[in-house]
Amino acid sequence: MHAIIETGGKQYRVAPGDVIRVEKLAGDIGSEIELPVKAAFKEGGELVSGKVTGTIVGADRAAKIIVFKFKRKKQYKKTIGHRQSFTDVKIGDVLV
């Protein structure tokens, strides 16, 4: 059984036991969360409604990216760095 969930503006195909990296979620490491389900599928490919639960197993920040802006002939240069936060979630159950 697998499901399609949506979080952080993106959709993920998940099955029980998967560990996925999603945009930062509120919650402490080890806490249980319920993820919004777009669709759930049984083994035969039948579409059913369902519920997905997961556990937060980690949180970190991605590698820094550099954003560089400039305007030619105007002596304007600007450098900015950005690190995106993410959360690792272990999928527990896909319930129908």
From Swiss-Prot:
GO molecular function: rRNA binding; structural constituent of ribosome
Cellular component aspect of the GO annotation: cytoplasm; ribonucleoprotein complex; ribosome
Gene Ontology biological process terms in this record: translation
SUPFAM superfamilies xref list: L21p-like
Key words of the record: Ribonucleoprotein, Ribosomal protein, RNA-binding, rRNA-binding
Domain of life assignment: Bacteria
Family: Belongs to the bacterial ribosomal protein bL21 family.
Role this protein plays: This protein binds to 23S rRNA in the presence of protein L20.
NCBIfam families: L21
UniProt subunit comment: Part of the 50S ribosomal subunit. Contacts protein L20.
Protein name: Large ribosomal subunit protein bL21
Species for this entry: Solibacter usitatus (strain Ellin6076)
